[in-house]
């Protein structure tokens, strides 16, 4: 049954200060980022409330609180607006005006038994220069990335999701070196079981310290022995906000520029931020290319090893002659030849990653050309295998997630060994074991291969390919959300223009 967050649009004033405090705390339930202060002045009770990291605290103190509390006048809304002429003063009477104002960086003042709240704009515009992501390349869409400042990261999330329905729970982890963690989700959307599971794992974490969100992920994921990531890590605020709006849970950590997103599925690691901004008939083929690239990266080199070692009869005659000529002076069997080149590729990749950006790119390109040419001329490897190795390496780069790309690259090594020992049977055995492992995996207790297993036909158009936006009126059924409807299907139908 579809549920929506309901908020009163009526004038709830006048109120007692304690009643207003209870009302605001109920609206910002489980969010520790609401500051609500009570003062008494000239026998009148005054409340000042705002979201701390959305405003400039020095300006609030100097331009608002000091004149307000040091004055000897008897305050009223009119007196405040006249005494503190900051040009942004307004009166709000309804909750559906006050709550968005708080999220937009306004400071609210309420005098007990008045008929309205006085609002001033103190938005914190002096933000740290947000830079681009280091591990996630963005072609279309916002380029900014998270920083090491938890306050800045929360500020960005609040700006992207401007609703009091956004719950931000404060949790502290680490006994010897405590770190602040924020559990973020939408109260009217996220599955309560998922939220409780994540909260329990964080609260029960009994460790001395946690250095980063990537380390935190290894403590709280479902299967720490698996090579595959079960939580999505991202440096992009828009990806995090989009996941929260889909009903997922995000975790931000102090001094960490990455967010954790759960639950995640195997297919979600092949979704790029560009998919959201591109047209469906452009995004779907690109997503299909990523899936095919993953398969090519895992099996292409093992297929070469198996065919040349055991099943050369399946190779076309002309190609077989070329392979024979290229391998004429190679003293090693194909399996050792492939493992050697794969290891060289990984060494060049790792060396390029540890060097400065421009130097690392040069080392990767020049080193690959030099090592490949020298290996062929020395008779250590064949030039045809270099082509297969290069295609496999390029295919692994198409994975938008760095963790998933690393997992795919590492899978090639056992697959090459199996192909060198058992041929095509070894490859099939390796793929079967891989599928069985993926079928057993979960993320926050939910199937990792959803919506393929268990099959959810309604979710296929969101996980494997994309349909036009006006066809995606439902959220993921497999997440068991409180509200599965994104928008009214009837209102999404095409309407005639006015002049038709």
Where are these regions (language model features)?
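Membrane-interfacial loop-to-transmembrane-helix junctions in polytopic alpha-helical membrane proteins
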Residues: 278, 282-285, 326, 352, ...
């Amino acid at each position: 049954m579809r549920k929506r967050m309901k908020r009163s649009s009526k004038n709830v004033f006048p109120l007692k200060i304690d009643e207003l405090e209870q009302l605001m705390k109920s609206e910002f339930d489980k969010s520790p980022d609401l500051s609500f202060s009570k003062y008494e002045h000239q026998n009148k009770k005054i409340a000042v409330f705002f979201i701390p990291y959305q405003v400039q605290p020095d300006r609030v103190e100097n331009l608002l609180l000091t004149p307000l509390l040091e004055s000897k006048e008897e305050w009223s809304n009119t007196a405040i607006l006249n005494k503190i002429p900051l040009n942004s003063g307004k009166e709000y009477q309804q909750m559906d005006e006050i709550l968005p104002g708080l999220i937009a960086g306004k400071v609210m003042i309420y005098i007990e038994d008045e008929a309205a709240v006085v609002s001033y704009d103190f938005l914190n515009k002096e933000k740290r220069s947000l830079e681009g992501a280091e591990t996630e390349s963005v072609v279309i869409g916002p380029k900014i990335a998270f920083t090491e400042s938890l306050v800045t990261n929360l500020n960005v999330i609040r700006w992207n999701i401007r609703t009091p329905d956004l719950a931000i729970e404060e949790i502290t982890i680490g006994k010897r070196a405590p770190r602040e963690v924020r559990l973020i989700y939408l109260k009217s959307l996220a599955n309560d079981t998922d939220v409780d599971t994540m909260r329990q794992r964080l609260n029960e974490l009994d460790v001395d310290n946690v250095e980063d969100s990537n380390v935190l992920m290894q403590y709280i994921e479902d299967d720490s022995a698996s090579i595959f990531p079960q939580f999505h890590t991202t440096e992009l605020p828009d990806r995090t906000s989009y996941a929260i709006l889909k009903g997922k849970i995000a975790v931000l950590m102090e001094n960490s520029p990455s967010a954790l997103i759960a639950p995640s599925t195997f297919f979600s690691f092949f979704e790029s931020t560009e998919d959201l901004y591109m047209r469906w008939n452009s995004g779907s083929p690109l997503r299909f290319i990523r899936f095919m690239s993953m398969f090519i990266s895992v099996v292409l080199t093992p297929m070469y090893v198996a065919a040349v070692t055991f099943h050369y009869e399946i190779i076309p005659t002309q190609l077989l002659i070329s392979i024979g000529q290229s391998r004429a002076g190679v003293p090693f069997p194909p399996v050792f030849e492939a493992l050697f080149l794969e290891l060289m590729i990984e060494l060049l990749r790792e060396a390029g990653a540890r060097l400065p950006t421009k130097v690392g790119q040069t080392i990767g390109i020049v080193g690959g050309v030099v090592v490949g040419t020298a290996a062929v001329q020395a008779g250590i490897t064949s030039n045809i295998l270099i082509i297969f190795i290069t295609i496999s390496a390029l295919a692994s780069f198409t994975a938008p997630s760095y963790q998933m790309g690393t997992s795919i690259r590492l899978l090639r090594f056992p697959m090459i060994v199996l192909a060198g020992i058992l041929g095509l049977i070894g490859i099939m055995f390796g793929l079967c074991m891989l599928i069985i492992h993926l079928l057993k995996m979960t993320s926050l207790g939910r199937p990792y291969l959803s919506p393929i297993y268990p099959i959810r036909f309604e979710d296929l158009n969101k996980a494997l390919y994309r349909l036009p936006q006006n066809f995606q009126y439902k959220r993921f059924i497999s997440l068991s959300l409180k509200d599965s409807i994104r928008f009214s299907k009837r209102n999404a139908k095409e309407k005639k223009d006015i002049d038709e």
